UniProtKB/Swiss-Prot annotation:
Coiled coil: none annotated. It catalyses: deamido-NAD(+) + NH4(+) + ATP = AMP + diphosphate + NAD(+) + H(+). This is NH(3)-dependent NAD(+) synthetase. Mg(2+) binds at D39, E144. Catalyzes the ATP-dependent amidation of deamido-NAD to form NAD. Uses ammonia as a nitrogen source. InterPro entries: NAD/GMP_synthase (IPR022310), NAD_synthase (IPR003694), NH(3)-dep_NAD(+)_synth (IPR022926), Rossmann-like_a/b/a_fold (IPR014729). Belongs to the NAD synthetase family. ATP binds at G33, L34, S35, G36, G37, I38, D39, S40, T139, K168, S190. GO terms for biological process: NAD biosynthetic process. The keyword Ribonucleoprotein does not apply. Pathway: Cofactor biosynthesis; NAD(+) biosynthesis; NAD(+) from deamido-NAD(+) (ammonia route): step 1/1. GO terms for cellular component: cytoplasm. It comes from Methanocaldococcus jannaschii (strain ATCC 43067 / DSM 2661 / JAL-1 / JCM 10045 / NBRC 100440) (Methanococcus jannaschii). Homodimer.
């Protein structure tokens, strides 16, 4: 079990946290970006359990290359939970930026144009958060946070992060426990930033392996100790350690000179 606790205890801790943060902010509730993936689905389920369906707004923000199945799954989550949801297509915004793949003169750039999508979605989330006095509930998990798998000032930006202390493999267990639809749990995780993209292909590592390394990293183990304990190739372990170090800037505020 997670941290040696039962699933019920984990759910109770997270839902208590959500309620407390909403009350502290004197907010009317939360807004969640629904991608149709497991992380946003679990976040939405937990927010509804914490606050009730009337205090949770879902935002579905597809563009022309979004997998229709993902939109279908996002709507399924919103409708299963009975929450209000808004579909805001971002294709025209991408065209206005002259993003690659959306105007004839530019080819798609995975980094620049992929990150642009995440930042546009962040702006829309905060627009509705401001409009209705809501907190933005982020959907990043602990695995993503450690290795920097997210867009700075994009999907990383949020007011609260309900599943931010759960590794990806733990999110999957929790999803089964709280009743997230099976088809969402079992499909390959994807940030949905370009057609056919999957997390594990982009990260070049399976989440099971990644989480095994990260849990031992948290305990202060060296790459050599992790290799000896798990038999995971040292090259893979060093790769994960490098990702953690390289992406530290995504976990901290911008550096400021001392004066």
């Amino acid at each position: 079990m997670l941290w040696g606790e039962s699933m019920e205890e984990i759910v109770n801790k997270i839902t208590k946290f959500i309620r407390e943060k909403v009350e502290e902010a004197n907010a009317n509730g939360v807004v969640v970006g629904l991608s149709g993936g497991i992380d946003s689905s679990v976040t939405a389920y937990l927010c509804v359990k914490a606050l009730g369906k009337d205090k949770v707004l879902g935002l579905i923000m597809p563009e022309k290359n979004t997998n229709p199945k993902d939109v279908e799954h996002a709507k399924m989550v919103a409708e299963n939970l009975g929450i209000k949801y808004i579909i805001s297509d971002i294709t025209d915004i991408l065209k206005a930026f002259g993003a690659g793949g959306y105007v004839p003169t530019r080819e798609f750039d995975k980094i620049a144009d992929g990150n642009l999508k995440a930042r546009i979605r962040m702006c829309i989330l905060y627009y509705f958060a401001n409009k209705y006095n809501l907190l933005v509930a982020g959907t990043s998990n602990k695995s993503e946070i450690y290795v920097g798998y997210g867009t700075k000032h994009g999907d990383i930006a949020c007011d609260i992060r309900p599943i931010g202390n759960l590794f990806k493999t733990e999110v999957k267990k929790l999803a089964k426990y709280i009743g997230v639809p099976k088809e969402i749990i079992e499909k390959p995780p994807s940030a949905g930033l370009w057609e056919g993209q999957t997390d594990e292909e982009e990260l070049d590592i399976k989440y099971e392996t990644l989480d095994t390394i990260l849990k031992l990293y948290e305990k202060g183990k060296t790459p050599e100790e992790i290799h000896k304990e798990t038999n995971i190739p040292l090259e893979t372990i060093n790769y994960v350690f490098d990702l953690i170090k390289k992406n530290e800037h995504k976990r901290t505020l911008p550096p400021t000179p001392e004066i």
